[in-house]
Structures are given as structure tokens and as C-alpha cells.
Amino acid sequence: MRLHYLLRLLSFAFLWFILRSFLVKYLNFFTLGFFFCFSSTPRNFAYLVALFMLCLSTFSAFSNLTLFSWAKYSKLSLGSNVSNSTVVESSYISVIAPFFKIGFTLLSLLSLSPSSLSESNPCQDSSDSTCKSSVLSFFASSISASKFKLSLNVFNCSSITSLRSCRIFCLSSIFLSLSCSLINSCAFFCL
């Protein structure tokens, strides 16, 4: 009965991480790429979208902390062969990583001039280099964040091998991270 409950919880965590990966990574690419540089959307709307992404990244950091705290407790209860230091170390890394993305998003927000938020998108003008540089810096931060997440997933897959569901989840996360990293890399070099 307890194993059945644990498997259901792992399945819910698997679906949640897929949804979160789509929201945090793909939404970052499409919103800042389309609304911020490739359309005539006013900058105040792009500013609100960036703030929404900032909230998602913050929620992602605290959800990682909650999930890995639960994982630490469950592994201690089940008597897994994964050491406590491994679980604690991976939890701290998973919480620190989204905060780097939060910092890069804040830098992108600060690069927007508050006096021109109500104007049309200045990226339509090819002579404006401020918006272009901020978008390029955001794509560069997305590339580094994806690679950091990829290395973290490889670390988790090599350490958590007791449950089949954990391995399936880790491999799926690696595939998503590779896909996001390739998309961000292509967007960075095409701009």
C-alpha cells in the first residue's frame, strides 16, 4: 500500500516537472523572443510577461526545495542506499540554479527604460541596440541554465537508481533539457 502511494506520488511529480519545464523554459523562449523582439507588442505587456516568468522561476526554486526535502525524508524512511549528503547536496543545487535565472531575468527587466514602457517595441528599429543586447543576454543565460540543469539531471540519474520511476523521470528531464538547450542555442546564433 505504501509502495503504491509512493508510485502515485512519483507519477504526479513526473507530470509536474514536465509541465514546469514547458512553462519555465519554452515560455521563456517564445514570450521574450516573440513579444520582445519579433512583434509590435507594446513594451509594457512584454514587461508584465517577464514579471510573470520571474514569478514562475521563484515558484520553481521553492518547489524544488519542497520536493527534495520530501525525497530526503522518504529515502531515510525507506532505507535507500543513497547517502544523505547526496540528497542534501542535490537539493541545494536545484534550489540555487533557478535563482541564477531569476537574476538574469531581473537584469533583462532593468535594461528596459521605464520612460519608454508605453511606447511601441523599439526592437522594430534595427538601430536600437539596447533591446537586442538584453535579449541576447537572456538567450545566453537560458543556454547556461539549460546546460546546468542537464548536468544536474545526469548527476541525479547516476545517484538515484533504486526506483525505475526515478530513472524514467531523470531520462525524460535530460531529453527536455537537451531540446531546450538546442532551441535556445539556435535562437541565440540566429539573432
From Swiss-Prot:
One of its GO terms (cellular component) is membrane. The chain crosses the membrane at residues 12-32, 48-68, 92-112, 168-188. It is found in: Membrane. Its main location: membrane. Keywords: Membrane, Transmembrane, Transmembrane helix. It is a multi-pass membrane protein. Partially overlaps YDR412W. This is Putative uncharacterized protein YDR413C.
